[in-house]
Amino acid sequence: IRDSATLSYYDPETKTVENEVFYRANAMKLGDVAQSMTIRNDVGWVVVNNSHVIFAIDINTFKEVGRITGLTSPRYIHFISDEKAYVTQIWDYRIFIVNPKTYQITGYIECPDMTMETGSTEQMVQYGKYVYVNCWSYQKRILKIDTTTDQVVDQLEVGIQPTSLVMDKNYKLWTITDGGYEGSPYGYEEPVSYTHLRAHETELHL
């Protein structure tokens, strides 16, 4: 359903929920599939996947203060600085570089061994000057990006279709893979009830 995405606000003090806060503040719908939201400096960045847009909103009034357009199918935004952020995509072999101050696309990071049909980058975490990103749909890799050059400098093969990526307090990366689906030309891994992951045996040097 198009324009089905909504934004709600939960107040932990009163334990109440306000629905449709974006629509009520801006008199327009968010669009189709609000995939993720990141807050930075009192601005919320709402990534709307199928509508190819990122809305910047004031988190106190929920009013739009800007938007980034011209994206393929955005998934997540990660801020490198006040003037540079990365936006991951599905159905694209590139990670977009944007300027949050001007809301403009300023460049691209080309991901190796991807096409427009098989391209997929998802969540991002940062350690020092490096950003790590899991490649989800039809992929099985984690990429390492140097933020000073905006280039992929290393990669690690993991299980099929890593869906998420986090870094723990000991600076270790953890990912979850969904294994694809039976009959997929890109591979399939049967689910198991228990897996012991020895992180020290499969390592991507930070």
What are these regions (language model features)?
Residues 17-28, 63-68, 104-114, 151-156, ...:
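A short beta-strand motif characteristic of beta-propeller blades
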Residues 32-36, 73-78, 118-123, 160-168:
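Repeated scaffold domains used in trafficking and secretory/extracellular systems
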Residues 39-41, 80-82, 126-128, 168-170:
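Residue-level detector of Asp-centered blade-edge/turn motifs that repeat once per structural unit
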